Every structure is written in structure tokens, then in C-alpha cells.
A protein has these predicted regions:
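Helical "lid/coupling" subdomains associated with nucleotide-phosphate turnover
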Residues: 2-21, 32-213
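Short acidic, Gly/Ser-rich segments with clustered Asp/Glu that frequently serve as metal-coordination loops
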Residues: 25-30
Length: 213
């Protein structure tokens, strides 16, 4: 997955001068370190966005789909970024709604995202290239969409961090697939469209002559 995402969200100059890609998916967080246009290190960690959702579900006593919606719509990776507002959560089976402060939600989310980023920091250091990442870190995947994730990453990793959105598409459903959660899929499409890949498809097209029945 890091290879697929890299084609969609990384600039070629970033891969040349050194960059770490952190793809926070649902079930895993994929890490890849690039330098001199070469993948120097990869790792897959079984702590990702679903763990954040589970923390919210257990912490607030809500259903899983409610927890996912709360994470995506109101979540923050840093408690100080959460506005002083309350969220009304519909009660289960007709019960009275719950009201939860956004700062409370952020306090549930932050420790898990910190854990993900701290593990990523260990893997980046393990690569031996942590001092050579002039382009810093690029975060992608659905888990990176939680507000403040890039800022928290910069703080924990001690380097520049940005959210990577799929690029390289010039027509069609560009807006629809520019979300980081589509990075891997878009990257694989772009990889397949590279000039050196055209013509390598195993499928055959037979041209029918006009005289053929």
C-alpha cells in the first residue's frame, strides 16, 4: 500500500531529497521512507483508524457508526484544537440523547493518534534515514483526516508534516477522489498509466477486419 499511495500523494522532488510517508488506514498504518527516489524502509503497523473509532465507541458508550461519524465530523487530534462546543448524540433505541463536549472527544482521540505517530517515529529512526528527510513527513489515508493530525505529527516527529491528497488527475471525478482515503487506489491507477506500463497489460484486443462476419 505505501507504494501505491506514494504515486498519488508524493512529489518526485520529495522522494529525491527524502520523505517519510505515513498512510493511516482503517486496519493498518503503512510507513515508507524514500530517499534518492528509492524506498529505503517500509513497515506495517496494526494500529490505525479503527482503533481510534473503537476508543470513541467505548469511551462514550455509542454505536460504532456513531463513533466513526464523531471521529470524522467533530474529532481533533489535539485537545487544544477542539472548540468549546457540545455535540448532541442520538440515544439508542429511543433513549434520551447524550451531549458530549468536543474537547472530551479530542481527549479520547489524541492518545491513540499519538501512539500511531510515536510508532511511526520509531520506524523512521530504524530506517537509518531520519536525518535525511528534507521533505519531512506526508500523512495520508482516512485516519489522517482527523483535524490537527499534521500538527501533532510535526510536534512528535520533529519535522515538517503535511496531509497528502491524491494528485495527478486532470479530468473526471477529480474532486471525488482527492480525499486522502483514496490515495492507494488513485496511486495504483497512476502507476498503471505510466508510459512504461502502457502495453504491458495481459489483455488482448482483436481488431476485426471489415470482411469478417
Amino acid at each position: 500500500e505505501p507504494l501505491g499511495s506514494s504515486f498519488a500523494v508524493l512529489h518526485s522532488d520529495e522522494k529525491e531529497v527524502g520523505v517519510a510517508l505515513i498512510d493511516i488506514g482503517g486496519g493498518t498504518t503503512d510507513i515508507a521512507v524514500f530517499e534518492d527516489n528509492t524506498i529505503r524502509h517500509t513497515a506495517v503497523v496494526a494500529v490505525a483508524g479503527n482503533k481510534v473509532t473503537d476508543d470513541i465507541r467505548k469511551g462514550l458508550g455509542v454505536m460504532r457508526d456513531q463513533a466513526e461519524a464523531l471521529k470524522c465530523e467533530f474529532g481533533a487530534a489535539m485537545a487544544e484544537m477542539a472548540p468549546d462546543e457540545e455535540i448532541a448524540i442520538p440515544g439508542v433505541a429511543g433513549r434520551t440523547e447524550k451531549r458530549v463536549g468536543r474537547s472530551t472527544l479530542a481527549q479520547i482521540i489524541q492518545p491513540r493518534i499519538e501512539e500511531i505517530l510515536e510508532i511511526a517515529a520509531i520506524e523512521i529512526k530504524r530506517s537509518g534515514f531520519s536525518r535525511h528527510l528534507s521533505a519531512g513527513v506526508v500523512l495520508t489515508g482516512g485516519g489522517s483526516l482527523v483535524k490537527g493530525t499534521a500538527e501533532l505529527a510535526a510536534e512528535i516527529l520533529g519535522m515538517d508534516a503535511r496531509i497528502g491528497r491524491p494528485m495527478g488527475l486532470t479530468a473526471g471525478l477529480v474532486q471525488e477522489v482527492s480525499d486522502p482515503k483514496f490515495a492507494t487506489g488513485v496511486g495504483l491507477v497512476l502507476y498503471g498509466l505510466r508510459p512504461e506500463m502502457i502495453g504491458s497489460t495481459p489483455f488482448r484486443t482483436d481488431h476485426l477486419d471489415a470482411s469478417d462476419p
